[in-house]
């Protein structure tokens, strides 16, 4: 979730990284492997560790197109009822919060089997 200005800035940096030649998954891994809060400095350090210029990111993060991208993402999240991370969408179900991998896999398998993340006799047709 976006909790502070520093969190907004980290999201802006993530947008810029996603638009760069850097592998976004590498950025994500570096960012969430760091200790402490995900904030401006953590995002800048993660991007810089992948070869992006800290100065360029700081100069570009306030650009109107970055603000527009952030607003679009926020609008979509609001429309889907997402207020935090992580949130999973499986089928038409919104599942907030972290899930153990086994639970996530089971819910996906259930969706494939019965059309719901939790199968019941009626969901399975009998």
Language-model features: locations:
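Structural alpha/beta surface segment adjacent to cysteine/selenocysteine redox centers
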Residues: 1-48, 83, 114, 118-126
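C-terminal cap of thioredoxin/glutaredoxin-like
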Residues: 44-126
């Amino acid at each position: 979730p976006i909790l502070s200005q520093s969190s907004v800035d980290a999201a802006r940096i993530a947008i810029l990284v996603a638009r760069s030649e850097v592998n976004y998954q590498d950025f994500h891994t570096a960012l969430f492997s760091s200790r402490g809060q995900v904030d401006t400095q953590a995002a800048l350090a993660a991007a810089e560790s992948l070869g992006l210029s800290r100065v360029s990111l700081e100069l570009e993060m306030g650009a109107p197109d970055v603000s527009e991208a952030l607003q679009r993402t926020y609008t979509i999240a609001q429309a889907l009822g997402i207020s935090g991370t992580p949130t999973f969408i499986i089928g038409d179900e919104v599942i907030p919060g972290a899930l153990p991998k086994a639970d996530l896999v089971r819910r996906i398998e259930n969706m494939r089997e019965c059309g719901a993340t939790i199968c019941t006799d009626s969901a399975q047709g009998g």
